[in-house]
Each structure stands twice: as C-alpha cells, then as structure tokens.
Amino acid sequence: MSDQDSSTSSTSFPKYLEHLSGDGKAIGVLTSGGDAQGMNAAVRAVVRMGIYTGAKVYFIYEGYQGMVDGGSNIVEAKWECVSSILQVGGTIIGSARCQAFRSREGRLKAACNLVRLGITNLCVIGGDGSLTGANLFRKEWSGLLEELAKNGEIDSDTVKKHAYLNVVGMVGSIDNDFCGTDMTIGTDSALHRIIEVVDAIMTTAQSHQRTFVLEVMGRHCGYLALVSALACGADWVFLPESPPEEGWEEEMCLKLSENRARKKRLNIIIVSEGAIDTQNKPITSEKIKELVVTNLGFDTRVTILGHVQRGGTPSAFDRILASRMGVEAVLALLEATPETPACVVSLRGNQAVRLPLMECVQMTQDVQKAMDERRFDEAVKLRGRSFEGNLNTYKRLAIKEPDDKIPKSNCNVAIINVGAPAAGMNAAVRSAVRVGIAEGHKMFAIYDGFDGLANGQIKEIGWGDVGGWTGQGGSILGTKRTLPGKYLEKIAEQMHSKNINALLIIGGFEAYLGLLELAAARNKHEAFCVPMVMVPATVSNNVPGSDFSIGADTALNTITDTCDRIKQSASGTKRRVFIIETMGGYCGYLANMGGLAAGADAAYIFEEQFDIRDLQSNVMHLTEKMKTSIQRGLVLRNENCSVNYTTDFIYQLYSEEGKGVFDCRKNVLGHMQQGGAPSPFDRNFGTKISAKAMEWISAKLKGSHGTGKKFVSDDSICVLGIQKRDLLFKPVAELRKATDFEHRIPKQQWWLKLRPIMKILAKYEASYDMSDVGKLEPVHNHGELSAI
C-alpha cells in the first residue's frame, strides 16, 4: 500500500493490526552509535511485535560491525530472549562504531549476510549517523545484490525475491539532538541521572555555601544542559546553540553575588560539554571555576558527570516511548512498499508519527551548520519549538529584571493548590510567581486550599520566596480536598477584601470541581468575575481537558521502580506471581502505563470491564508461562477497577487456581505514589505549563485594571492542558460534557489506545487500532507545545 493509499484508508474505515501480516518476512534489528537507556525496551518491542505478526526477527549484534562480519553476529530472536530486559540500561545486542560499513566493500558483505537469511527489513536504533548509513545502504541495495549475483555469491532468483530493502529508524540518543522528534530514546533517563546528582550536590553545597559547576553531556546540543537547568533552577547555563553575549563574565558574577546577597547558600552553574562563546571558542568548566574564584572568591567545585548520564535504569517515560516506537517501527516495515521512503518513528506531543528520515537528518545537520556559521538565533529555531520554549522560559525564571524596569500592572493574582499532593506542584507555583512578577503583577499565595482562602490565609509572595522550590515534592503551600461550595460567601469576601484580580488553581479533580462551583456562583458573587485558570496536577491523571497532569510521571516512576524490585524477588523465588495495587481512583492510567513500563502480564482497570472468564484466561496464560524459562508473573490492578474483584479476591483466586504451578503474593503500593522528589518531566512540565497559564492571565487582564471590567464569559474560566500536540485553554463549561462525574474521569482517554500494546508484548491476542498511524508526515508539522 502506498503512503497515499494508507492515508486515504485510515480516514475511510478503521485499520486494524489484523489486516497486516509478517508471514514470510524477516526483520533485522540493530543498535548503533552511542548507547542510550531504553534501547532494550525498543529491541524487546520490535522482537515481540515482529513475532506476533508472524515475521522472523533477527538480532544483529554489535551494530553495523556485526552486519558486516555476519556469522554468529546475526541470530534469530525468540520471544523469551527479550524477557527481563526492560529495566536494563544500554543495549543487550551491543553497539559499535564501524569503519568497514563506510566503504562499499563493507556494505557488500553486509548485504550478502542479510540476503542469505532473507532479511529485507531493517530496524535501526541509533543517532543521525547510523540512520544516514542505513538510508545509503537502502539506496544501494539493488546494486549490491546485482554485484553479488555477478560474483556468483547469490543466484538471480534471490535478487528478484529480495529486490528491495525497507528501513525504519528509531532515534536512540541521550542528547535529544535529532530534529523532528520531541524526545529521543534515552534523554529522559539521562535527565534523571543529572537531576539525581544535582539534588545530591545541593545538600553539600548548602552546608558549605559553595558554588558548583556541573558539566553535562551534549557536544553539539544543549538540550540536557538547558532542561536540567530549568529543572533545578540553576543560576546560569551555557549552551552551544545560545552562547552568552560579550561581557558575560561580569554579568554572571553579578548574578551569582546578587543571589548570595539574598541569603542563597549555593550557586549552581550548568555547562554543556560543547559550550562555546560567540566566536565559537570553547567555554570550559575549569575556565568558569577560575572566573568565579578570581572575581568573587567563592568556594567553587567542578563536577563532570560523564558516562553516568548514559547508565542506570531507564525511566518509565523512556520504556513507554521505546515500546511505542518499537511497535510502530514494525508496523511501518510491514506497510512499506518499494516506493516508501526510509522513515524515522518520532514522538510529537503524545503521538507516535512517521517522518521522512533524510529530511530529519538534513535538518539536524542544518543546526550544526548554523552554529558553525555563528547564526545562533537560527540554530535555536531549527532545534524546534520545544527547545526555543525551554530557553525562553529559563531566561524569564532565572534572571529578575530590576523593579524600576518592570511595568506595573496594578493587578493582584492569587495561586492556590487544591486536591491531593502531587510532585511538581511546587515547581508550578515557583514558575507562576516569577512569571507573574516579571509581568508586573503582585502575586499572592493561598495556604491550605479553599479552607485557607475562606479563612484569609493569603500572603504576598516574592521572587526570592520561591527559590529552591523546583525540586521539592508535595505541596509547600499546603493542599486540601475541600470544595469551595460551603464557603462561597467567605471566599468571595476574602477575594474582594484582598482585591484579587485573577486566580490560578493548581490541582486535581477537586480543583476542576471547585472551578465549576466558582463558575456557577459568578452570578451571585462579583468577586468570582475574574479570569480563573486551572493547571492539572494529580498522580491519577484524571482531569478532563488534558492528556497529562503534573505528578503522574513521578508516580509512574515510583510504580515502575517498585515493580522492578518485585520482579527481581519473583525471579529469585521462581514460579511466583505478584499482584500489585496502584492508585488512581477510577482512572486506570497508572495501572495501564505502569504495566507497559514494567512489562506486566496483565493490568486490570475500570475503563475496560472484566469478568471471571478474563481472570481465568490470565491464570491459564500464567500457567503456560511457568512452563517456559520465564517463571514469574506480574499483574497490576487499579484500586477501583471493580467493586467485587478486589485485590484480595484476585490474590485468593490466583493462589487457588495456581496451586501446584505457582504461588502468589500481593502488594498495595499506597501513598508512596504521591511522594518523593519530582521527576525531571514533572518539574519541567509544571514549570512550562504554569508559565503559559500566567501569560494567559496577563493577556486577559491587560488594560482591565481600574475599568471595573467583569469577566463573565465562558472563556475566562478555563482548564489548561495538552491534548495530542496542542496546548489548549478549554472553558470548564465545555468540559462538563466530556466528564464522567460519578467516576471522576474524562469520558475519552487517549492512553486506552496503548492498551493493546501492553497485551501484545505480554503474549496475548489483541485488536490494535492503527487508524491514527500510517501517514508519513512533514517534518515541520509541529503543535503548540511538545511534551517536555
């Protein structure tokens, strides 16, 4: 099917995986270039999805070197040989740089090794160099086969039968330096390593009043440096794409000394290893240290993170990303025709898309060219909206303009946390406070939710008051589940007396319900006729109007880490099945996505009703599994998935039915899912989305002060969220129709489409709707705001 046919059919009727078959096809999977956490999850997904569709899948060990050497380097993969690799960093099939593949002679050997095994589909996981090599190989394929036939190494029938090579790429790189995708496999895990180090360093730096210069990876791309600076509230950051202006030395020293004068006990400077000045000369960590010591006399230390960033366990985000990419790569290979160009599977917002490989490579090379030619503004733009947005947000939050330079709006904006605590709430508050002050507003903090608002617990909050909040879990302002309904009179009175001109609510489903109650009370209380916006923050990820909520990623990582430990325990014991109960209310997001990230055998959720036959089927599936070399099982259950099929019931059923085959244990994770330091994703998501919310408030308030203007329209009371690739302000009046109030969940949930992936990778038959995929998209088709 051509690309055009594929796009037509996807709009005319649902397209299901059952329509695709891999019978008679062979797929080769290799990892090339620098390793990245999450590569194993991608390999696992390719192997299992390929086998599921009926194709043969081959491991190509040691990257292109293994392809050139052949022999025992190209081995057929079995279902069980990718078990227990999700939680392992690096790549189990090895990666190596290969000079031989750069020559035609080397590629001729590689073609011979592949065609003898019937491999005409290649899935390459690597950086732009690896993907460029794969595309060249694809172009030369028919010529290479003809040459092999002429040399008598293969016959003419083999040339006809395997005339075309299909290539699909997945970008595995911790640097996130590939244009066209919001996130490359490994980047989120590398950010986890950096933030773990920064959090650890902060305690020692505070003890001694030290300045730390942290050098992070990224030779030609400053993404890791920029996002980690945003995530830890660094004082200064050096990037290759955005060199500091002339005289930066004095400006940086002034900023550091001002921060120290505000009683800040530590300074953090983050340097990308490829940092340069405007003359393209390197800026090294040692040079920065020397500068700080000489000019300020501060006790300064340098920490070079190095290969620590490539190591460790992949984050939940990387496992889910890589699993989705791997499945999509197999589908792209099976749908490919001789006319289909080589494509790369990418992430846009929360959607997996296919992009023309060479267009992405060209754009990536254009960034480097722009930097070499000192066209730095263009280089930042070419990196994409996400990078540019991160840079602008960092600049706004890191450096405070002098008070006399900030135009006063004479507006008072209040911030409140509502609902259960969620990691990342404090980052969101910090961002809102600083952006609000930069916009000229007076910012007020409301303590202890709507209870606190009714009781007048409202204080002005300044720029320095929120320093160091980004990395702190929970809610510093205090949060309660109380709704405003019973306090409407008091709340209106407090808002009127404090002259509150706008309200930013950060919280979960209770915050959404509270917003609805305030909207309904506008006709009675004039104090509520002000712009109000809600930023979703809940581990449950159940707020209508947004695909993601602040805190859900941190909870997902907690679940994934716990499941890894439990699986290890089960592997040691043998023949053991664990039942894990997750939070989320009636929303199955944590159970489903946790199951995908941890490699669970099943996940029971409220959104997909199940009965005793399904439980019986799962028990039989686990019984069969115990006959293989993988003698353990993992089952996740959302806390409210069923009134009668409780965790205890499922545990007892499995224990009874598995008697003599496997034994069973249960584990209720509980409130540990709400705690801990926020993940890099939640810190940055909270920071960016709150900044956008404050910009919206400023736009609404512009010119309204002193006019007595009342905000009564639906579009002045909104929920801000990401949907697919776009950042949207949705009026709560509109969202009411999209809400299941009884069960506190949205009526439509995007992640349910990923449910079949979890089932397929756990060896179940599943119907996978491919209607949303299959189209090759242009590289420049970007949404408003990418996932961080």
UniProtKB/Swiss-Prot annotation:
Subcellular location field: Cytoplasm
Region annotation Interdomain linker: where it falls in the sequence: 400-411
UniProt GO molecular function: 6-phosphofructokinase activity; ATP binding; fructose-6-phosphate binding; identical protein binding; metal ion binding; protein-containing complex binding
PROSITE patterns given in the database record: PHOSPHOFRUCTOKINASE
Positions carrying N6-acetyllysine: 395, 486, 688
Carbohydrate attachment residues: 540
Location of the region described as N-terminal catalytic PFK domain 1 in the Swiss-Prot/TrEMBL record: 1-399
EC numbers: 2.7.1.11
Keyword Nucleotide-binding appears in the UniProt entry: yes
Residues annotated for Mg(2+) binding in this entry: 128
Residues modified to Phosphoserine: 2, 6, 12, 21, 142, 386
Function: Catalyzes the phosphorylation of D-fructose 6-phosphate to fructose 1,6-bisphosphate by ATP, the first committing step of glycolysis.
Subunit text: Homo- and heterotetramers. Phosphofructokinase (PFK) enzyme functions as a tetramer composed of different combinations of 3 types of subunits, called PFKM (M), PFKL (L) and PFKP (P). The composition of the PFK tetramer differs according to the tissue type it is present in. The kinetic and regulatory properties of the tetrameric enzyme are dependent on the subunit composition, hence can vary across tissues. Interacts with ATG4B; promoting phosphorylation of ATG4B.
UniProt-recorded name of the protein: ATP-dependent 6-phosphofructokinase, platelet type
Lineage of the species this protein comes from: Eukaryota, Metazoa, Chordata, Craniata, Vertebrata
